[in-house]
A protein has these predicted regions:
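Conserved N-terminal segment of class I S-adenosyl-L-methionine
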Residues: 1-68, 86-90, 95, 116-132, ...
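Short, glycine/serine-rich, charged loops/turns that create anion-binding
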Residues: 56, 107-109
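Conserved beta-strand signature within the Rossmann-like core of class I S-adenosyl-L-methionine
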Residues: 97-107
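A conserved beta-strand element that flanks and buttresses the S-adenosyl-L-methionine
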Residues: 72
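Hydrophobic adenine-recognition pocket in adenosine-nucleotide-binding enzymes
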Residues: 76-79
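A short acidic, helix-capping loop that chelates divalent metal ions and anchors anionic groups
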Residues: 109-116
């Protein structure tokens, strides 16, 4: 099952995400980089979920006063320039949540930005991303799996 309009040719396996949220008993979720809020709305059917996206005025609120237990960040990091990833991941880390769920594309998008650059600015292999996540979240367990048919990786991070 998927959600949204298939933006950048990835579809989310909602069963896997739902299982992750269930296993880690997620109640308060932040959808970091929520875009138009499709996943936020979907998750609000079963959880309390807030959407944050600095590029979308409607969702440009980091909700720092809320005690989230889980952050989901799907199809976001590949859109961030490599030089800005450390700052972004450290911002995510500063929420001090128990569990995090990322999906990251490992291929270039079909879509170009108005200036001609590819929409996916940081396209790296699984091991590169794994090292970045393990370095940033060194106090947690990091599991990275590759979904080659979708040209993406799934990253699960939780307390040791």
């Amino acid at each position: 099952e998927g959600y949204g309009n298939g933006y950048n040719d990835t579809t989310l396996n909602l069963d896997h995400l739902s299982n992750f949220l269930s296993v880690y008993e997620s109640k308060m979720i932040l959808d970091y980089g929520c875009g138009k809020g499709d996943l936020t709305k979907y998750l609000n059917k079963s959880y309390t979920c807030y959407g944050y996206d600095p590029a979308i005025e409607e969702f440009d609120n980091e909700y720092r006063g809320i005690d989230f237990d889980t952050i989901v960040c799907l199809d976001v990091l590949e859109h961030i320039p490599e030089a800005e990833l450390d700052a972004l991941l450290n911002n995510i880390k500063s929420y001090n949540v128990d569990s995090l769920y990322f999906i990251v594309s490992t291929r270039y998008a079909k879509t170009k930005l108005p200036d001609g650059r590819n929409c996916h600015e940081t396209v790296k292999p699984k091991d590169w991303w794994k090292n970045l996540f393990e370095t940033t979240f060194s106090d947690k367990k990091v599991i990275v799996t590759e979904q080659k048919t979708k040209n993406q990786i799934r990253v699960l991070i939780h307390e040791n």
